[in-house]
Structures are given as C-alpha cells and as structure tokens.
Design a protein with these regions (language model features):
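N-terminal amphipathic/basic-hydrophobic helices that include classical n-h-c signal peptides
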Residues: 1-15
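Metabolite-binding pocket within alpha/beta catalytic cores that recognizes anionic/polar moieties
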Residues: 15-169
C-alpha cells in the first residue's frame, strides 16, 4: 500500500503492477501525455496553465536540458540558483491538471520497466503559477494569491479514495 500526501492529508492507495491500458508509456520511455521521461523530472516543478508561460519562466533558468511539446503540454528542465527545476504547462481545466499530476506522480514513483511502484517514495515540490478567481469581494483583480490548496467543485474528486476527507476542508 502506498500513501499519497495531498493537501496535508494522507490518502491510502492500493497499486500493484499498473496495466498498459491504465498508464501508457511512449516508445521513447516517456509518459504518454506530457512526454517527460523519469530522469528528466526535477524534484521542484513549476506548473503554469498557458503553454506560452513555460518559455517566460524558463527565461530565469540556466543549463536548459530540453524543451518538449505535446499538445498543450510544454515542458523544460533547467537550473535556478543551482537548483534543478522542471517547468510544465497544464492547459485549462481539472481534467488536464489530473492528467499532469497523475503522470508526474508516475514519473517520480513508478518504475517504468516493471510498471510497479518504487520502494522509495519520491516527493515533488509543486508550485502553480497562474491566474485564478476569488470569491471574496475584498480581493481586487490582479492581486497576488498564495494558497495552500484548492478544491474543485466539478466532481473530479468523487473518483478518488479519500474524497470524504477532502470534502470536509
């Protein structure tokens, strides 16, 4: 049994070997949608919605290792002040975020040869930079917002174990 840490909550997940139909690995060894290989993923990941923002953020990086693009998923890995960072676009919507987060977790924690969870869990630091709406009238448009977590009201979490814990946030 593996434990997924999401928003400070420990969610138990039961995974054995992941079937080819459940997680597609491209012929080049990359994750199907985001086209990243496990060794290309840094421990620090910056997510942006708009693919055009990847190059803007990457402008602050040195030692760029690659730039991939597949549909709305654009990625690059480089260094900022000596720290390795991956920048990746998600596109719009919770469906895309779900795809990206699932594939990032697989890149970090699944052995792509055996399709089984790795014995040692790798934790990623993920920072999302982008636009958002606010439900508080006292937050003016254009204000910087720093959140600890977000919860969608679209029903996506109904497909995950631990949804009852998350619904009480």
């Amino acid at each position: 049994m593996n434990i997924l840490i999401f928003g400070g909550l420990n969610i138990k997940i039961h995974i054995m070997r992941i079937a080819e139909s459940e997680f597609i690995i491209n012929d080049d060894g990359s994750a199907f949608h985001i086209h990243l290989k496990p060794e290309e993923l840094a421990d620090i990941v910056i997510l942006v919605g708009d693919p055009g923002r990847v190059d803007m953020v990457a402008g602050f990086l040195t030692d760029i290792e690659f730039r991939h693009q597949s549909r709305e998923f654009v990625s690059t890995t480089g260094k900022y002040n000596g720290k390795r960072i991956t920048v990746l676009s998600t596109g719009i919507g919770t469906d895309n975020i779900d795809i990206v987060m699932t594939e990032l977790d697989a890149l970090a924690n699944v052995d792509f040869t055996t399709r089984e969870p790795k014995k040692e869990h790798r934790t990623l630091t993920i920072l999302r930079i982008g636009t958002c709406g606010a439900v508080q009238a006292d937050i003016p448009l254009g204000s910087p917002i720093f959140s600890h977590y977000s919860v969608g009201c679209d029903g996506l979490m109904n497909w995950y174990e631990g949804r009852d814990e998350l619904s009480n946030l």
